[in-house]
């Protein structure tokens, strides 16, 4: 299957990096390589880009799509939470800009055998890379009802989490749940008819929650952002695109902490803790897709872009 993916907030996110022709940049979520291609087009012959993705299909796609930049593009098949280690191994001490696009690629969603989508019946999987050992199928069939409800409530923010978990456990006692279609049917049965008539697909939040749990997405996000900011040169920029409120809240709070790290009581006339701001926040409010973009790519509707700049410290 061809690796198809429409890059979200493409120009806004790359404009936010303020590309320097001879700079070094990192695309931490290579995906369909659309953002990487735009960065490389703006770089001069001395500029370099490191592309990180744990999905072998994304790495293979990028190798083909970006082959016109052989000396400038370097692909790394790893999880982006290892950015500090990756740059150290490449003998790169500082970079000019870093991009994160935290959405699941259209390719992953539209490839049934990856088991990400509630729109295609396939084996339950949801692992983004070979390093993940536990699949969604194992979570759904093996963990307790309480743990399942916690995952759906915490990562999916689904009001019916407890009821969905109860229905899943009831069904798996009869037979194991193997496919996305089987899970969708259980969720539809669990969610009351009235609630199903409104809002998104009833399985959307549960599938999101399982994907986040399988890939440990949120647990590593805050520290990854801090490591990324540490890797930036003074004046370097970081652009982060999120697709749901949990991710956006983590990025927002981490940026706020890095921009104002002082822990002194409000009554103190001057700072005594000695903690210095590391960044300035460029986007007071997140940038969202235009109407034109949403017409061409409805999947972009929940995207939010936040940008920050490293201070001279």
From Swiss-Prot:
It catalyses: cytidine(1402) in 16S rRNA + S-adenosyl-L-methionine = N(4)-methylcytidine(1402) in 16S rRNA + S-adenosyl-L-homocysteine + H(+). Keywords: Cytoplasm, Methyltransferase, rRNA processing, S-adenosyl-L-methionine, Transferase. InterPro entries: RsmH (IPR002903), SAM-dep_MeTrfase_MraW_recog (IPR023397), SAM-dependent_MTases_sf (IPR029063). It holds the Pfam family Methyltransf_5. It is found in: Cytoplasm. GO terms for biological process: rRNA base methylation. It is an enzyme of class 2 (transferase). Its EC number is 2.1.1.199. One of its GO terms (molecular function) is rRNA (cytosine-N4-)-methyltransferase activity. GO terms for cellular component: cytoplasm. Specifically methylates the N4 position of cytidine in position 1402 (C1402) of 16S rRNA. NCBIfam families: 16S rRNA (cytosine(1402)-N(4))-methyltransferase RsmH. PANTHER family: 12S RRNA N4-METHYLCYTIDINE METHYLTRANSFERASE (PTHR11265:SF0), S-ADENOSYL-METHYLTRANSFERASE MRAW (PTHR11265). Belongs to the methyltransferase superfamily. RsmH family. This is Ribosomal RNA small subunit methyltransferase H. It comes from Desulforamulus reducens (strain ATCC BAA-1160 / DSM 100696 / MI-1). The gene is rsmH.
